[in-house]
Amino acid sequence: MMMNRDILFHQQQQQQMEENMSNLTSASGDQASVSSGNRTETSGSNINQHHQEQCFVPQSSLKRKRNQPGNPDPEAEVMALSPKTLMATNRFICEVCNKGFQRDQNLQLHKRGHNLPWKLKQRSNKDVVRKKVYVCPEPGCVHHHPSRALGDLTGIKKHFFRKHGEKKWKCEKCSKKYAVQSDWKAHAKTCGTKEYKCDCGTLFSRRDSFITHRAFCDALAEESARAMPNPIMIQASNSPHHHHHQTQQNIGFSSSSQNIISNSNLHGPMKQEESQHHYQNIPPWLISSNPNPNGNNGNLFPPVASSVNTGRSSFPHPSPAMSATALLQKAAQMGSTKSTTPEEEERSSRSSYNNLITTTMAAMMTSPPEPGFGFQDYYMMNHQHHGGGEAFNGGFVPGEEKNDVVDDGGGETRDFLGLRSLMSHNEILSFANNLGNCLNTSATEQQQQQHSHQD
């Protein structure tokens, strides 16, 4: 019996082992097939998912706009409260202490302290609670329409105070006003703790003021950059063409100045009678037969372009004109020198004196402390001083502003023998006549003395 049981048990174990082996092989095959199928499915799903991601990339990249306030439930009850109701702070008053409350439930809770009967509203399960939305009472407000109504009573109150109410709360530090007390308290906590510094050095405690100031500074910097010339462009402009153009401008300026002194027709809206009256008084020795007494190509004013240094800048700086005292000293030196023959001495004397007087008159008319102040400005001031209502209208150099300010003795000496700093046109001409007569008389006397010595 025992041997039969052992044999049966041994056979059962062998059968069980064979079944396990067969199950393992079948399971491995099924698993392999399942894994291969899963691989193909996962690869296919990955491809589809990648394709779907590529399709949805443009949609995710778009920025979502923020919803504007006031998007109520279409089924909500629209409440339109009056401005008086919205601005009321104490709608519910306590009968004992006359303390006001905004809500009835706050009043009921307050009554407990007075040992008064109080009652809170109880909601029953049968009552259907309908949501309420509130519109702004102002007709021109965007929240006046029911589609833009606000869903909170506190929110509509604050909106009405901020946009349409009076700003009662003022910050003591920055003087900014608020209509809502909570906004004022929130601002007071951070006011003065943070500073906004501009590049120009100005400090601001408020961000909005800083932004406004910064925009103004940026605009001013752009305008200044446009107005200031570029140094590289200035250096590049030092070309022969530029100097030729500048020389032509200077020649035109000198020729126009000579035409004003020598001709009776002025370049400007002046009357013909006034121009003839002024130039009839010019002495003949000033407008001599020799149009070029000082050798400057027929111009009373020497060309500015001749003294331009091409290595520095394209804008020539005019050399300071000689003062009247220096010219008189030069005249004394020229008068002290003697020529070899009387004829040459007489010619050189007359030429020197004519050159001196012409240069002196030019210096009196063109020796202000500031460059660019010439005969046209002197004549314009003199013309306005004598009642003439018309002035030059850009006859000399177009684009330049006329300087009507007279220097109070800060520059070099302009007058002769202690006269005032600016003489009228008639006084200059009379002085020139007297000076010319004196010079001619002295030259004649000197010539007579030389003839007497030779005899």
Swiss-Prot record:
Return the PANTHER family for the record: PROTEIN INDETERMINATE-DOMAIN 7, SERINE/THREONINE-PROTEIN KINASE RIO
Ranges that cross the membrane: none
Gene Ontology cellular-component annotations: nucleus
Q: Where is this region: Disordered?
A: 1-52, 235-351
The protein's matches in Pfam families, at most eight in alphabetical order, are given as: C2CH-3rd_BIRD-IDD, C2CH-4th_BIRD-IDD, C2H2-2nd_BIRD-IDD, zf-met
Q: Name one GO molecular function term.
A: DNA-binding transcription factor activity
Spell out the protein name for this chain: Protein indeterminate-domain 7
Report the gene name: IDD7
Q: Which residues bind Zn(2+) 2?
A: C198, C200, H213, C217
Q: Which residues carry this modification: Phosphoserine?
A: S82
